[in-house]
Each structure stands twice: as C-alpha cells, then as structure tokens.
Amino acid sequence: MENASEILSALNEQDDNKDDSATASDSYNYDEHLWTAPSCAEKIVNIIKDKLSEYDKENAEYYGSNADEYNKKLEQLDYEFREVVENGNTKHVVFADRFSLKYLFDDIGLVYSATYPVCTKYQAPKKQTVSYLEKRIREEKLPVIFKNEITPSGSAEKIAKKTGAAVEVFNTCHTVTRKQFEEGVSYIEL
C-alpha cells in the first residue's frame, strides 16, 4: 500500500509543466499540496480508507463504500477540469502568488508562471519575475491573473493594473471560512 510520502516522492519526479523562465533564479522545492489534483486526492482517500479499515475492521465496509462514493465525485471533478483545459483558449496560467497547484496542473496539462514556484515564506516578488509575468500576460493576451484565496492581492493588483488583466482567486482547496464549514462546503465544492 502507498502512503502519503511515497505518493509525494513519486509525484515530485514529474515536473514537466513548470515554466522555468519565470523563476529561473529560484530553486524548486517539493510541493506538499498533493490534494490539489483530484487523482492524488483519490489516492489519499484510499490510504485513509485502508488505514481506518485496518484499525476498525467492523466498519471496513462502511469506509469502503464512503471512499468509493467520494472517489466517484473526485473522478467527475477531474473530468470537468480536463474538459475546461481541453476547451480553453490557453494552456498557460499566470499566478501573482505562491504556487501550490503543481499536481493539478501536471495532471490536466496546464503550464504556469508564478511569482513564487512553491509556497515559500511571503516576501516581495523579484522585479525581474514581475516584469517577466507582465510580458507573458501582454504577449499571450491573457485576460486573467490568479492569486490564492488567503493571500493579499497587492502583487496581483499591481500586475493587473499594468497589463489590464483581471485578478481572480484560484482556490487551493484547503481553506474554508466558518460559514462555508457550517454549510458543509467541501473539497468538491471549492
């Protein structure tokens, strides 16, 4: 059986869709955000199911049926992501933020440029990186620049102002508000 660290090791070997030009001077570290790709989330669900079933054999069938049901939702979500990418106008996405969607982008065939290649300690982005992102947005006529749901939008707003791109939030599926939690919002809805 795979465990989370084995999944992480295997997935980090796949690093084909990173746009090195935006962050050439930064070293790329592993990304612990496995859950951002539905295919990885399925593996995590199966690990949880197996562990729970191992420790609570009486309810193994219950855990199995719940995992199967949730994995069907994850498969549908994965399908919808792939459809959007297949029918989209571009495969390049710009993030004026820390990038935590490596596994999702690798899975669905998107390429990214970001102010930071991974979730590093927040600091002002490098000028050459910002200039590069602005150039890519203009050259490719990208209408949107993304930021994460919990990050202040300062960098994104500055780049948007210079390029005319709109700022949108890309939810990384690990933060919910109290209201969302009380309403039962989960990974699938985010």
Identify the role of each PLM range:
Residues 1-190:
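Extracytoplasmic metal-acquisition and chelation regions
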